[in-house]
Structures are given as structure tokens and as C-alpha cells.
A protein has these predicted regions:
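Transmembrane-helix motifs of polytopic, lipid-linked glycan transferases
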Residues: 100-124, 161-165, 354-358
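Short helix- or helix-capping micro-motifs
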Residues: 19-22, 129-141, 158, 165, ...
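Membrane-interface transmembrane helices that cradle and orient dolichyl/undecaprenyl
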Residues: 123-127, 155, 163-181, 185, ...
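Membrane-interface alpha helices of multi-pass inner-membrane proteins
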Residues: 132, 166, 178-193, 203-204, ...
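Membrane-proximal stem/loop segments at transmembrane-domain junctions that anchor or position
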Residues: 241, 247-322
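Loop-to-helix entry region of an early transmembrane alpha helix in multi-pass inner-membrane enzymes
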Residues: 16, 73, 77-81, 91-114, ...
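Hydrophobic, aromatic-rich transmembrane alpha-helices
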Residues: 2, 114-116, 204-208, 323, ...
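Extracytosolic helix-loop segments that constitute the early lumenal/periplasmic catalytic or substrate-binding loops
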Residues: 24, 28-36, 44-71, 78, ...
Length: 424
């Protein structure tokens, strides 16, 4: 009986359904507190909702700020098209569309349990896999974000950990067709969230080192993956070149994000008006057009960084704290918080940092071969956000990898014992 219970607890199917139940419970509880008119509009008052509405109305990939400002490359294409399909089916800016989008987010987030379970099983053992799955089932950001953000965050988390799982499987079965599927999958992932590409070189290096074949054959496989990923993205890149007469591989908004994190509002000695309003920026965007607007913001951001190197480093340090703690002043916010949920999330973030560090140490000591691909997620993926803007939403794609590392830290004694036994 005890053995059956243990097997049940280690079942990825059970973990998935519990994870889905928790996310749906949070979704419906929180949605019940919000007026229906707000649910129908507020979650979509962002760039994704604006472009999706334009697509659903047959206007094309445009109108990024709810105004007729013409074509845009501000966003990667997959999630706006996905949301547009929901709008087309259930109506633009309706309560039903909100629930449909949030429900899909919950499913995406719960599905993370499957590839996460198998990644942990590959590195550790079944106890590690079960621990990783259960950690993800209750992971605060995994429960909260599907409701809070109608964005690609939950889908990106699923794709990010699926890429790690696919990488591990490719090392075990290096047939040519698997590399073809892997390259195509990478192309799709980049069209969902280009930031995932930051870990691609490290995963490819690991595959090159792990597959057993000649150097020439290994290089051919890696080149095939890269070419196929580029091929998948190429139609969108061509579309951007036709519309904007610029080389924009997937999305264009990085200069604006860089400026948002590096501008005179952060300088206490600046004589400029220390505020940024959405109205003013949208008005400027409408005046200049997307490319000129982004060039202006990029130039301003670079000039600010050049003139304020010390302040830039200080801001980057604050963003490092913010992306891992959810706020640049975690202790003060913990004391001021009037919500037990907010305090719990801050406390969980501390445990996540400690567990991630301990997990990396565990991998280095006991499973060193897996260090490169696993460490790329917490160490490389967030780097771009240290320069721009940060939030737990932006870190979310690497959260499943953090759950994996936390599980490795928790099951460290068993893994170390097994390693010594194998060595003996």
C-alpha cells in the first residue's frame, strides 16, 4: 500500500491535475472579485491585446497602442495571433475571451509539469522528478501569472523547459530526424519569445559535446538546427523588411525597453520632467512612426548610459534584485505589504534564490555534465533584463528550471549517495 502511494505521488499525471486545479481555483477566485466589465477590457489593455484585436478585425498585425498607427514589429507574432483566434471565436474584449485566454494560460502552466518531471528524472532520480513537479504545482508565479498576465509568459515557460527536455533527449538519440524536429521547434519558440534564444548557444554547445559521432557530423547536425530555426523565422523577418525597410529578425521594441530602464527619470539631478506617461509616449510614437520612434529612444538610452555610467550600474544592480525578488526593495515592501500573499511570494523568492544556488552546486558536484544547459537558464536568460526592465513575469520562462534546481537541492543526499555507490 505504501509503495502504491509513493508511486501515485510520483505520477506526473497526478501532479499535472493538481497543478491545473490550483491555477483554476486561483483564476476563478480572483476573477470573482473583479467586475465583469473590467475583466472584459483591463487584461487586454496592452500591446498584445491591441494587436490581437486588430488581427481579429482583419486590419493586420498593427495598431500596437490601440490607435491606427499602422503595421508594427513591436511583438513576436505567435501569441498575438493566438489571442486573435480567441477574439475571433468569443469576441474582442469580452469576459468569455478573458476566461478562454486565462484558461489556456492555466493549461500551459500546468503542462510544464511533464517536461519538468522528465528533465529532473534525466538528471536525478524519480524522487527528484516528483519533487520538481510538486514544486512547480505550487510555484507562486506559476499559479498567479496565468490570471494576472494575458501574455505569452505561461506559454514561454512551457516552451523553455520543453527545449531543455528536447535537448536531453537529443543527446540520447541523435538521429538526423530528431535534429530536424529540434530545429523547427526552436524556430517556433523564437517566434513566441525571442528572449529564449539567449540559451540556444549553450544548449547547442552541450549537444555538440554529448553526441557520440565525428566532429564533422556533429557540426553538420548543429548547423542543421540553426538553419532550420532561421528558416522558420524567415517569413516573419521578410515581412518586417517589407513593411519597415529594416532588418528586424523578429521584434523591434528593444530600444524602447532599454530607454525605459535608462533615462533621466532615474537621475535626481536631471532638470527634465521626471515622469513617463503612456499618453505622451503613444503620442510621440504616432508622430514619428515606429522606426523613427525606436531610433530616438535607442539614441537617448545610449546617451544616458554614456553620461551616467555609475548610475547605470546602480540601476542594473537594482534590477538584479527586482528580477529575483519581485521588487527592488524587498525588505521594505515585505514590511509594508498588506497582503499575506505578497509576503508569501517574497518569502518564496528568497527560498528560490537559495534553492537555485544550492541546486547549481549539486549539479556541479554530482551531475557535472548537465551544468551547462541547466545553468544557462538562471545565469544567462535574465541578463538582458538587467539592462532594461524587470518583473517576475519576465523571469517566468526560466522559473521551471529554478524548480528543477530546487528539487535537485532537496534530493541532494540521495543523489550523492547514489553517485558514491556508482563510483564504488
Amino acid at each position: 500500500m505504501n509503495f502504491r502511494f509513493q508511486r501515485l505521488l510520483a505520477s506526473p499525471s497526478l501532479i499535472f491535475f493538481v497543478a491545473l486545479f490550483l491555477r483554476l481555483t486561483f483564476l476563478f477566485y480572483e476573477a470573482h472579485q473583479v467586475p465583469a466589465t473590467a475583466l472584459a477590457t483591463v487584461p487586454f489593455q496592452n500591446e498584445v491585446g491591441s494587436v490581437a484585436a486588430a488581427l481579429a478585425q482583419g486590419q493586420g498585425f498593427c495598431c500596437v497602442f490601440h490607435q491606427p498607427t499602422g503595421p508594427t514589429a513591436w511583438l513576436a507574432p505567435v501569441y498575438p495571433f493566438f489571442l486573435a483566434a480567441i477574439f475571433k471565436t468569443f469576441g474582442s474584449f469580452t469576459v468569455v475571451s478573458f476566461y478562454a485566454a486565462a484558461l489556456f494560460n492555466c493549461v500551459f502552466s500546468a503542462l510544464v509539469c511533464w517536461p519538468l518531471f522528465h528533465c529532473a528524472l534525466r538528471i536525478g532520480n524519480r524522487t527528484t522528478a516528483a519533487a520538481a513537479g510538486w514544486l512547480w504545482a505550487v510555484f507562486p508565479s506559476g499559479v498567479v501569472i496565468p490570471f494576472e498576465w494575458i501574455w505569452d509568459s505561461s506559454l514561454s515557460a512551457l516552451l523553455a523547459i520543453s527545449l531543455l527536455w528536447a535537448t536531453f533527449r537529443l543527446a540520447d538519440d541523435s538521429r538526423r530526424r530528431n535534429f530536424i524536429f529540434y530545429g523547427l521547434f526552436w524556430g517556433f519558440c523564437l517566434l513566441v519569445n525571442p528572449a529564449l534564444g539567449s540559451v540556444l548557444p549553450f544548449l547547442l554547445i552541450w549537444i555538440y559535446l554529448r553526441i557520440g559521432s565525428s566532429d564533422r557530423r556533429r557540426l553538420a547536425h548543429i548547423a542543421l538546427v540553426i538553419c532550420l530555426a532561421i528558416l522558420v523565422c524567415l517569413p516573419w523577418t521578410i515581412r518586417n523588411a517589407v513593411q519597415f525597410h529594416r532588418f528586424i529578425p523578429i521584434r523591434s521594441d528593444f530600444p524602447f525597453e532599454l530607454w525605459m530602464g535608462n533615462n533621466p527619470i532615474y537621475d535626481p539631478h536631471s532638470r527634465q520632467l521626471n515622469r513617463i506617461t503612456r499618453y505622451e509616449e503613444v503620442h510621440r510614437y504616432s508622430q514619428l512612426g515606429e522606426i523613427a520612434f525606436l531610433e530616438e529612444k535607442g539614441t537617448a538610452a545610449k546617451e544616458f548610459i554614456r553620461q551616467h555610467p555609475a548610475l547605470t550600474l546602480q540601476l542594473a544592480a537594482r534590477r538584479v534584485v527586482a528580477i529575483w525578488m519581485g521588487t527592488p526593495a524587498p525588505w521594505q515592501d515585505f514590511q509594508r505589504a498588506d497582503s499575506n500573499l505578497a509576503r508569501f511570494i517574497l518569502g518564496w523568492n528568497v527560498l528560490t534564490i537559495l534553492g537555485t544556488a544550492a541546486g547549481l552546486a549539486c549539479v556541479f558536484i554530482v551531475r557535472r555534465w548537465f551544468l551547462l544547459p541547466v545553468a544557462a537558464y538562471p545565469l544567462v536568460f535574465p541578463l538582458v533584463y538587467y539592462l532594461t526592465q524587470v518583473s517576475l513575469r519576465l523571469r517566468h520562462p526560466c522559473d521551471p528550471a529554478l524548480a528543477l534546481l530546487m528539487a535537485l537541492a532537496i534530493t541532494w543526499p540521495w543523489l550523492r549517495t547514489a553517485a558514491h555507490a556508482n563510483a564504488g
